[in-house]
């Protein structure tokens, strides 16, 4: 455990998390659907989400905790410069997706571009191109997997999830293939929990068909990948570790 990196990351995460409401409030509203579904509920405005009571301090606490865990797992490495800023962004995306079932392109694509740029800077600083190559391959592979899932079952997954998959693939790829595989797979496992737990608690199998936004669970899975991906991968496939 890297306590120095954990402390620095937690402080940075807390500061970034405090500005989550401001970030959400500046996201432009999407273009209205020309043919909305008759039973579609009105979208909650981003400004209303940004004004939720206590969102700033709650986001700061969650971001600090998650960033601290990331720092403790990774240590004072260049990849931390890529990962820590993604923590408050991930909190913002999770909040927005949970309440609107949308992952704003204005947040995901610029973040992906910045992550790639920082990866290039890391290559220039450290001279190690292996992490960058692995991250680029992971971006393409993970995005392609999610694109295929979206193409064959678009009702269960939005294209925002595909864009987010590219960002997470690149970020996890900076660490290793264990983090990529465990991070992506964990997202699907965690996604299955809410409906299952509700169905068990209420003894209603119909709740298994309840729809939940996928983005927040992808982000939780990515965090799991960062924290235990390498260890899980090494224990399952020691020859590939």
Write out the residue ranges for each language-model feature:
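A membrane-topology feature that recognizes alpha-helical transmembrane segments
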Residues: 1-241
């Amino acid at each position: 455990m890297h306590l120095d990196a954990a402390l620095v990351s937690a402080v940075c995460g807390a500061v970034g998390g405090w500005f989550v409401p401001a970030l959400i409030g500046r996201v432009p509203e999407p273009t209205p659907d020309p043919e909305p579904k008759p039973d579609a509920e009105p979208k909650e405005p981003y400004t209303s989400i940004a004004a939720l009571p206590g969102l700033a301090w709650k986001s700061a606490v969650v971001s600090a905790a998650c960033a601290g865990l990331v720092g403790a797992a990774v240590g004072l490495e260049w990849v931390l410069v890529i990962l820590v800023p993604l923590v408050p962004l991930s909190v913002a995306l999770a909040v927005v997706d949970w309440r609107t079932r949308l992952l704003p392109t204005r947040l995901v694509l610029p973040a992906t571009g910045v992550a790639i740029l920082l990866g290039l800077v890391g290559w220039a600083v450290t001279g190690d191109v292996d992490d960058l190559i692995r991250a680029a391959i992971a971006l393409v592979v993970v995005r392609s997997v999610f694109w295929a899932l979206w193409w064959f079952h678009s009702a269960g997954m939005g294209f925002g999830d595909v864009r987010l998959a590219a960002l997470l693939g690149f970020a996890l790829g900076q660490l290793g293939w264990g983090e990529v595989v465990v991070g992506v797979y964990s997202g699907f496992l965690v996604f299955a929990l809410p409906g299952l737990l509700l169905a068990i608690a209420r003894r209603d199998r119909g709740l298994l068909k309840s729809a939940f936004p996928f983005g927040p669970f992808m982000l939780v899975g990515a965090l799991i990948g960062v924290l235990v991906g390498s260890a899980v991968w090494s224990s399952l496939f020691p020859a590939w570790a």
